[in-house]
């Protein structure tokens, strides 16, 4: 009987040590593999529930697009056995060109909108203004939530990357893809999701 007990205790210790090694061991994760690992660490997601909620699905798809900023190349480097990673070839528009495009769209759509608004009956215009006032508090709440998350992510970024500017430029996904991330480092990505869940629960009460 004592021998069986020692055997069980030994197996338990081996399992615990393996789990501890797994937490501290850095794994190289890229693209969908990185996103799936983060989702798994943040908690089991009820996908049938997520499909009904458009905003959260869009958040996941946006996160997926950001994570997949590196595309694997089939060729391999002569110095290493790992695949060579290159940046996506699609050019990203600059902020100046984006601003110019938005201004052009505003200039084109504004006269037409004003003309339609001027021809609306007085009652309809009152309803439109009252509906926009009803939406304003909700928009303000979303903006405050985004500011809070941005500040938190900046603080965590400094803790995670330190004061090294080159590391900050490389970014989270590139570091996990090229050098590897531990589970402790990946858990940092769960904090915005936890805040989102808490906000949803608060709104439901």
UniProtKB/Swiss-Prot annotation:
Its domain of life reads Eukaryota
An example Gene Ontology cellular component term from the record?
extracellular space
Tell me its family.
Belongs to the insulin family.
Question: Which Gene3D superfamilies does this one have?
Answer: Insulin-like (1.10.100.10)
Organism this protein belongs to: Bos taurus
Tell me any Pfam family this protein matches: Insulin
Give the signal peptide, or none: 1-19
Q: What is the lineage of its organism?
A: Eukaryota, Metazoa, Chordata, Craniata, Vertebrata
Q: What does this protein do?
A: May have a role in sperm development and fertilization.
InterPro entries, A to Z? Insulin-like, Insulin-like_pep_6, Insulin-like_sf, Insulin_CS, Insulin_family, Repro_Hormone_Insulin-like
Going by the UniProt record, its keywords in alphabetical order are: Cleavage on pair of basic residues, Disulfide bond, Hormone, Secreted, Signal
CDD domains membership: IlGF_relaxin_like
Question: In Gene Ontology terms, what is one molecular function of this protein?
Answer: hormone activity
Which protein is depicted?
A: Insulin-like peptide INSL6
């Amino acid at each position: 009987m004592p021998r069986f007990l020692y055997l069980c205790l030994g197996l338990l210790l081996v399992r615990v040590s393996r789990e501890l090694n797994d937490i501290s061991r850095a794994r190289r994760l890229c693209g969908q593999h990185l996103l799936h690992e983060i989702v798994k660490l943040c908690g089991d997601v009820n996908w049938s529930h997520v499909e009904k909620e458009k905003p959260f699905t869009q958040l996941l798809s946006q996160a997926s697009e950001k994570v997949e900023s590196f595309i694997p190349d089939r060729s391999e480097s002569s110095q290493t056995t790992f695949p060579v990673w290159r940046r996506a070839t699609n050019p990203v528009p600059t902020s100046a060109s984006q601003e110019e495009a938005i201004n052009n769209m505003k200039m084109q759509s504004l006269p037409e909108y004003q003309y339609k608004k001027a021809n609306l009956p007085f009652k309809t215009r009152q309803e439109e203004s009252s509906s926009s006032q009803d939406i304003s508090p909700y928009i303000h709440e979303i903006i405050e939530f985004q500011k809070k998350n941005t500040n938190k992510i900046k603080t965590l970024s400094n803790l995670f990357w330190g004061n090294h500017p080159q590391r900050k430029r490389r970014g989270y996904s590139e570091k996990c893809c090229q050098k590897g991330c531990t589970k402790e480092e990946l858990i940092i990505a769960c904090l915005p999701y936890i805040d989102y869940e808490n906000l949803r629960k608060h709104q439901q009460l």
